[in-house]
Amino acid sequence: MSASAGAGFASSETDVAVVGGGAAGLYVALRAAEQGARVTLVSRKPLAESASYWAQGGLAAALAPDDSPARHADDTLNAGRGLCRAAAVEALTRHAAAAVAELRERGVRFDTDRNGGLSLALEGGHSARRIVHAGGAQTGRAITGRLAELVAANPGVEVLEETSAVALWSDGSRCAGVVTEAGAIGARATVLATGGGAALWLRTTNPWGAIGAGAVLAHAAGAAVADLEFCQFHPTALALPGDERDGTLLTEALRGEGAKLLDASGSRFTDELAPRDQVTAAILDRIEADHTDHVHLDLRPISPEGFPNVFATCRASGLDPECEPVPVAPAAHYVMGGVVCDLDGRTTLPGLYAVGECACTGLHGANRLASNSLTECFVFGARVSAAAASAMDSGGPVPLPEWRFEPPTEATREAVWRRAGPRRDATGLEELCDDPYPLARMIARAALERRESRGPHRRSDYPSRQPELDGVHFVIGADGSTRRERWT
């Protein structure tokens, strides 16, 4: 095959190597196997124990009689603050309903209303009810659990659980597979589905493994990355006294059903259903004005039966959401940037594909619309699986790389939160450029280059949005240089 392992190093071959066991990785592995490819799925954790598992919201799809893909697209473009790639938005919104239908056919049980139709929730930034969910706020668990069952039952997929990728098998000109702790896997196509990097910030809603490994692996192998200055901070994560790290997510759907944000005086201060960057900014302004570290989310207007796990989580933290509002503050939630790829997942490095949160197609622009991310996994996952399954071997042997991935330290997480958090400036970002973790440095460089405030990227030294940067993406190439690109 195209890969070449050194003496004494275990190696194997497959058609498609998928790195990541969340929703995107499971789906791509399943679809590629169904198209006749031999698939090896590498998962750092047991199947389905990923960030996708914890997704509370749902899938956004225009299914209601008064809704349409065009309306969904308008909401996505509005949330994206002038940076969405129109072709990606059109692809997602046009095929979202079909993705939901396929998941139902595969056995995912979504919540239904009293008439047996899909129950559609409302979330911030959406102009219509279009969020399909399962178990109230356990959508990720329902989807990844079912996909894991289907993958385990498919003989075309070899699953390597609790196995970490430490490098991509690349010579800088093409990717020939993946290197794991246990050995090297040669592949015609390698698909990164490693999730995002929001756990690189100290206060996060993500599991601690969400450290942006995909972007680091890809860039080290020779692929370009982009839009890394944009990390979405979810407005409503629990803010428990004395615990700066806790970022337990309280789903946006709570506000869609009537939960209210209150300041220190008990007054409402913002539109709870505005896009996330707008709500987060309002909360941060109010926290600063009130000289506190949180605001409150009043859950008393909604029924506990609709969100049993949310109310249980609050009670487990010593809170009584049925009697009094709970403390919340923003936490890092989703990185819009990642590995640059087209709508079929092809990166700038031949042989390497990316899908899900680790990918950067330009779909989300500067600010992701709520619940578009799970939909993205399936709409674009279908395209990526087809492209990867049909990929052809394209060259001779590739030597194993010497570079190996090293995770970030606790000091890096603290530095990223304090210097590239919801509020940032040149001084802090320049300090972060010296961090030992590659992704922290790339985030800082991209944020320094974008001399404006847009979406969740808010610089106190450049507080205004600059119209001349509409549609401009800051891309960091394999050689480390930063360039500006406009994507169509």
Q: For each predicted feature, which ranges?
A:
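Glycine- and aromatic-enriched mobile tails/lids
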Residues: 3-14, 23, 31, 35-37, ...
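An anion/pyrophosphate-binding glycine-rich loop and adjacent beta-alpha core
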Residues: 47, 217, 223-326, 378, ...
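Glycine-/small-residue-rich beta->alpha transition segments that form the dinucleotide
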Residues: 189, 193-198, 358
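Conserved N-terminal glycine-rich FAD pyrophosphate-binding loop of Rossmann-like flavoproteins
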Residues: 45-77, 81, 245-246
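Short beta-strand to alpha-helix junction loop
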Residues: 84-97, 131-149, 160, 205-212, ...
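Conserved redox-cofactor binding core of oxidoreductases
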Residues: 104-181, 193, 237-241, 261
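Short beta-strand "acidic-cap" motif of Rossmann-like dinucleotide-binding folds
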Residues: 37-43, 227
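Core beta-strand elements of the Rossmann-like FAD/NAD(P) dinucleotide-binding domain
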Residues: 12-14, 181-189, 348
